A protein has these predicted regions:
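N-terminal cap/lid segment of alpha/beta-hydrolase-fold proteins
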Residues: 9-60
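Short beta-strand element of the alpha/beta-hydrolase
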Residues: 62-71
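Short beta-to-alpha linker loops that shape the active-site pocket of alpha/beta-hydrolase fold enzymes
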Residues: 71, 94, 99-103, 159, ...
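Catalytic nucleophile-loop/oxyanion-hole region of alpha/beta-hydrolase
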Residues: 76-85, 96-128
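Primarily recognizes the serine-hydrolase "nucleophile elbow" in alpha/beta-hydrolase
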Residues: 117-173, 181
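The feature captures the conserved acid-bearing segment of alpha/beta-hydrolase catalytic domains
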Residues: 152-161, 165-170, 176-217
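C-terminal catalytic histidine-bearing segment of alpha/beta-hydrolase fold enzymes
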Residues: 209, 213-216, 220-255
């Protein structure tokens, strides 16, 4: 594909006409959830300004879902995604939302290191951590699964071969070179022998579906294609206590 074709193949916002309205709804629901009892906001895990965690606890000794937000490593923030905690919390699973420095202020190597630093911090409080994330957060999930504190992973609508990212509009801010792309592409790295679910929407862009299916095959993970969901609506299946992704999470925690 040439640059124009690649740009279109990975432009999730343009592919979903009401994506802006969906994100606005996420933000409203997240604001409401952040007022709940048991919320500890902006816990600092590292030296950078965005090295902060929002923690939603059930008050019980239970597994933790550590969720990494998306935005092609260069936009969005953890606060927008608090709404996804609703489903796990209903089942007694604690939830952490991880923030990190965005490109171009940070290179991808540094972003990966920050997220692993967040897991260092969380491992002091939790013995069972399922790492999860959406879009760029799905990529960071795969890159973090090797962390000793991670017991399992739930990667949602992620990117696992970053060569297309290097060649399309995403790289205008991400600034990947070929070497950095290769060492941060999970599909080219040794498989981590831990339980992993690779989820994607069957109404997503074909390239996103391809990346998920090929990565799941490569690492012998469970591929979970969700009918009727695009790149944005798929997160409703984690926000809902009865959602498919919530059920997948329960399976990863043995519940």
């Amino acid at each position: 594909m040439d640059r124009a074709a690649l740009d279109a193949a990975y432009n999730n916002g343009a592919a979903v006409r009401n994506s802006a309205e969906i994100v606005t709804d996420w933000q409203a629901r997240s604001r409401a959830l952040r007022t709940r009892a048991g919320a500890s906001l902006d816990l600092r895990y590292g030296p950078a300004e965005r090295d902060r965690i929002d923690l939603f606890e059930t008050g019980k000794r239970a597994p933790l879902l550590a969720f990494i937000h998306g935005g092609y490593w260069q936009m969005r923030e953890k606060e927008t995604f608090s709404f996804i905690a609703s489903g796990p919390l209903e089942h007694g699973i604690n939830v952490a939302l991880i923030g990190y420095t965005l490109a171009p202020q940070a290179r991808l190597d540094a972003i990966v290191a920050e997220v692993r630093g967040a897991l260092d911090y969380l491992s002091e409080r939790y013995s069972e951590i399922v790492v999860s994330g959406w879009s760029a957060g799905g990529h960071l999930t795969a890159m973090s699964l090797s962390h000793p504190a991670a017991s399992a992973g739930l990667a949602i609508s992620g990117l696992y071969d970053l060569e297309p990212m290097r060649l399309c509009y995403v790289n205008d801010k991400l600034r990947l070179d070929e070497a950095e792309q290769k060492r941060n592409s999970p599909i080219f790295l040794p498989a981590v022998k831990k339980p992993l679910v690779v989820a994607y929407g069957k109404s997503e862009l074909p390239e996103l579906q391809r990346q998920s299916e090929e990565f799941a095959r490569k690492v012998n993970a469970k591929a979970l294609g969700l009918e009727g969901h695009d790149h944005f609506t798929i997160l409703e299946e984690l926000a809902s206590p009865r959602g498919t992704l919530t059920r997948a999470l329960l399976g990863l925690t043995g519940r």
